[in-house]
Amino acid sequence: MSAALERLNHLNLNHLYAFVAVAEHNSFTAAAEALGLSKSLLSEQLRRLEADLGIQLLTRTTRRMTLTDRGELLFGVAQRMLGELDGALSDVRDLQGEPSGRLRITAPQDFVKWHISSVSAAFIRQFPKVQVEMLADDQFSDLVGQRIDLAVRIGWPRDSGLHASKLCDFQQVAVATPGYLAGLPPVLQPHDLARCEWIGHTRLSTPWTWTFERQRERATVQTRGRLLANNTLAVYRLVLDGAGVSVLPSFLVAREIARGRLVRLLPGWRLPQGGIYALYPSARYMPVRVRAFIESLREHLGREPFRLAQSE
């Protein structure tokens, strides 16, 4: 047996979990609480891991803790390995019964509020052995590094190296409140939007330029505005408050249009269609709980009014 295999043969996985937890939390206290261990036992497990490997993994002072170069290398490998191991073990348990274990999901704040939260509530009622942790974040997360099982992303997918499954399509819709529109001439053509006060979304590459299509016609409008936000939910609130016009996804505004709180502008024209995607690190080792949640979310979205009638 080689020296490397000999070391692996005697390696305690609990010690490796302890090391990964300390590195993830950058704190012995937080890691000990997460693992349900005392700080003294956690320190002893790390000491034994370093002794088994014959290397120093981290340095500690009274004020801070840092990983050594070898510690950084081991952390990256161990984090991925233990994540896949947890998923595989959970999958084996799932095959023997219902889905179980922790499910970490990240999605934009507006989508968590309107959809992920309600799907999660129904999901844990259906599968009581599953714990769902929702991370409302508009930034693109490192799924492997943060041990996230599933990300929901809106719009047009980027080549991130992750597996993607489209859940449904949605329309982009120009909307405003009846009160805001009451003080303006009727908006009958795309160029009429140029005289409106617009609310811009700074995360879009061109927040002020919109191209509308109708059959073979195409009209590009250059808008203007004094309000900008980097969050779809903030733009939505500004529109509802009567601050101006903006383009929002149909899944966010369909109910308000039906209730008369918002007016869809230019219903005979279309903006580019977007998609809602489920992203996950591995299709081969996907735990059953993740697969079951994706199907629950797809079923939920299939009942939602994402496609607005062209005549609205």
From Swiss-Prot:
Pfam families: HTH_1, LysR_substrate. The keyword DNA-binding applies. Changing residue 52 to A: Does not bind DNA. Disruption phenotype: Mutant produces lower levels of exotoxin A. Mutant also produces significantly more pyocyanine than its parent strain. Changing residue 47 to A: Binds DNA with an affinity reduced by a factor of 2. Gene3D superfamilies: 3.40.190.290, Winged helix-like DNA-binding domain superfamily/Winged helix DNA-binding domain. Induction: The level of expression at different time points of growth is generally low. Expression increases when P.aeruginosa is grown in static cultures and under reduced levels of environmental oxygen, two conditions that resemble the environment within the lung alveoli of cystic fibrosis patients. The ptxR upstream region contains two independent transcription initiation sites (T1 and T2), and potential binding sites for multiple regulators. Under aerobic conditions in iron-deficient medium, ptxR expression follows a biphasic curve that involves the P1 promoter only. InterPro entries: LysR_subst-bd, Tscrpt_reg_HTH_LysR, WH-like_DNA-bd_sf, WH_DNA-bd_sf. One of its GO terms (biological process) is regulation of DNA-templated transcription. Residues 28-47 bind DNA. Residues 11-68 form the HTH lysR-type domain. GO terms for molecular function: DNA-binding transcription activator activity; NAD+ poly-ADP-ribosyltransferase activity; transcription cis-regulatory region binding. Keywords: Activator, DNA-binding, Repressor, Transcription, Transcription regulation. Negatively regulated by PtxS, which interacts with PtxR and prevents its activity. Disulfide bonds: none annotated. The keyword Repressor applies. GO terms for cellular component: protein-DNA complex. Belongs to the LysR transcriptional regulatory family. Plays an important role in the regulation of the production of the virulence factor exotoxin A (toxA), via positive regulation of the transcription of the toxA gene. Acts by binding directly to the toxA promoter region. Besides toxA, PtxR modulates the expression of genes that code for the QS-controlled virulence factors. It negatively regulates the expression of the rhamnolipid and pyocyanine genes, through the autoinducer synthase RhlI, and the PQS synthesis operon pqsABCDE, while it positively regulates the expression of lasB through the autoinducer synthase LasI. Monomer in solution. May dimerize on binding to DNA. Interacts with PtxS in the absence of 2-ketogluconate. Binding of the 2-ketogluconate effector to PtxS causes PtxS/PtxR complex dissociation. This is HTH-type transcriptional regulator PtxR. It comes from Pseudomonas aeruginosa (strain ATCC 15692 / DSM 22644 / CIP 104116 / JCM 14847 / LMG 12228 / 1C / PRS 101 / PAO1). The lineage of its organism: Bacteria, Pseudomonadati, Pseudomonadota, Gammaproteobacteria, Pseudomonadales.
